[in-house]
Amino acid sequence: QRQMCIRDRLYTSAGGWPFVENSDYYNTHIPRIGGATNSIINISTPRTDYDHQSNIRKDMPMVSHEIGQWCVYPDLKEIDKYTGFLKAKNFEIFKETLIENGLGDMADKFLYASGRLQTLCYKTEIEMALRTSGLGGFQLLDLHDFPGQGTALVGVLNAFWEDKGYVNDEEYSMFCNQTVPLARIPKLILTNNEQLKADIEFSHFGEKPLHNATIVWSIETQKGKLIKAGSFKCNLPIGSGIKVGSIEYPLDTFSAPTQLTLKVGIENSKITNKWNMWVYPAEKKTIKKKPITYELDDKAFEELNQGENVLFLSYGKVAPEKGGSIVVAFTPVFWNTSWNT
């Protein structure tokens, strides 16, 4: 009866877990990548052609709960910003540990490198949601860091809502906006005997549909040299996973390793997005096989004494209490280290 009286509101169960049949929409953690080492971006070759379609309920709108949660290295310069009763003791411990290990001068580089990885993961996760036709929306855990619960540095902004220096609003809004160009690319790492293939889509949740929009695309080198360009005419209704057109381009003219960028946008607007991909020669050069060892035995030292390079893989040799139990994956820590250990 209350719902019938208040028609300008939607009702759902507590966020993240329970499904209640009389909810207006289902807010669930199911359509998100998550922190497992067997997630799509940890076990798959780099690509952008996947979505959450198999997890979408047909009987009720779904909104994904707390997607992202990708952690970044702490910005130790933030310590001085805590001028009141609250002190960043956790950051002070991180700083002491870094200095004790002789890496005190690497703090800013660790922040930037991990921040760029975090940005890539957020781009991947948000675009996966926007490619999913019928998904009602998504909730990020947060745009800024949460300093509690074991230190959850999941934000692209710090705890003071300030820029941390590795991504700006212009780049972030390319893939998180009311209108977002999308591309389903089956391979981001290719050889020059293949074709670059991409199915172009859009997510559009603007005030009204866009009629007769001109969608422009281009392929450029890392230095900005234009390789190929084109356009599509289409209408963009309200929704996600809106199909626009397809691109195919042969790569046989690239004889050396080359980074390419596919850009897609709407003509005469700020709406744009981009994806990097890499092309390598299909013909592999013969190189001398380098020694690989799992133990520093006499044979390994013999190779080293002869001036050879030896790759030492110590997996399974490090004691658990020294870090041997830590599983390594492409993605950064999900939510926080304490939660995952």
Task: Spell out what each predicted region is.
Residues Q1-Q3, R7-L157:
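Substrate-binding/catalytic cleft of secreted carbohydrate-active enzymes
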Residues Y82-T341:
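Carbohydrate-binding surfaces of carbohydrate-active enzymes
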